[in-house]
């Protein structure tokens, strides 16, 4: 249990302190549930106010990707969400992509926070990837 907590908190601290490229995984039923699960894991190993934990999570986690297993056994991206904002007790997220069983992964909204992509010189690549996806040419 301690390893899970330590690993989770260290990943969160890495993201919060400006280390680019942090990546972690967590078991949850949706993107929104992943945020609550992360809060719970941190609370299990540390006596810290929930609001402080939520603030750190909101400022260090940018994108959430929910993978799931379909009825045929294939794993698919079911949802990609972005943390748009945080207000004292609630994360404001919006769904960028959502899986539809008849149409596959569909764009729902455009990325809100593009500053980091621009800072790291990746914004043009992101725009090109979205363009290809919309045209149905993305792999």
What are these regions (language model features)?
Residues 1-88:
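Conserved P-loop NTPase nucleotide-binding/switch module
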Residues 73-139:
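NTP-binding/hydrolysis catalytic cores, primarily Walker-type P-loop NTPases
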């Amino acid at each position: 249990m301690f390893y899970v907590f330590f690993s989770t908190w260290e990943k969160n601290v890495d993201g919060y302190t400006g280390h680019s490229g942090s990546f972690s995984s967590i078991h949850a039923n949706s993107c929104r549930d992943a945020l609550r699960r992360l809060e719970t894991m941190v609370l299990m190993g540390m006596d810290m106010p929930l609001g402080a934990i939520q603030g750190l999570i909101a400022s260090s986690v940018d994108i959430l990707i929910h993978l799931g297993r379909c009825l045929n056994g294939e794993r698919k991206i079911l949802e990609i969400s972005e943390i748009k904002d945080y207000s004292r007790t609630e994360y404001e997220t919006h769904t960028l992509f959502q899986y539809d069983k008849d149409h596959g992964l569909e764009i729902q909204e455009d990325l809100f926070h593009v500053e980091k992509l621009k800072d790291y010189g990746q914004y043009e690549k992101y725009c090109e990837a979205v363009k290809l996806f919309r045209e149905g040419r993305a792999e």
